[in-house]
Amino acid sequence: YGKSEKLKKNCNLILVLGCRDNISKLDSQQKDVFQEIFEVIDKYNLYGKVAYPKKHKPAHIPAIYRWAVSRGGLFVNPALTEPFGLTLLEAASCGLPMVATDDGGPREIKSKCENGLLTDVTDLNALKNALEKAMSNKSQWKLWSRNGIEAVTRHFSWDNHVRNYLLNVYQQNYKLMRLSSSGIKLSCLNGRSSLINPHSSNTSGSEWMIN
């Protein structure tokens, strides 16, 4: 952000750094993070352009996302690795497009939501270019916003999760019923269903786990 004249001219930056009472009472590693932020703000003269709220309540989070949407903003997740990315889904459900690390959960989310860009966050130029690109096309931003809202409901809601789970249970039971009716006996080893070929003398060598 500090190296992009385009971003500094057209955007403000809000850093969500958790909740704190007093920076002086944080542990040394946390203090180092804030010190680095202060130095970057000073180096690129970002005074008046960067905010880092002291506290927020869980109930405030949807309102923060929607406020960013009303401003035509982005949700940026520059973590080096992200196993899933619940915050990305929260942002998408509110219609806030993303720029995120090209790793793990964000890949799955983007493949289903198509609501932003992924980039190599270890390459600062690549991250800067992704942010500039995402902010420069308003029609694309609107499409990403709609895509996120629709896709989260379709792919990641609790109703959809339960529906898929019940469908998988039904499909597994259907497989078992068909195998049982065909004469193949069923057993349970270590809590998992196994298939046993009744015509084989070597039982241990003729078991298949059901996928």
Predicted regions: what they are:
Residues 1-9:
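Short hydrophobic signal-anchor/transmembrane segments that target glycosyltransferases
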Residues 17-21, 25-69, 73:
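Nucleotide-activated donor-binding/catalytic signature segment of Leloir-type glycosyltransferases, i.e.
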Residues 85-88, 106:
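Short glycine/serine-rich donor-binding loops of glycosyltransferases
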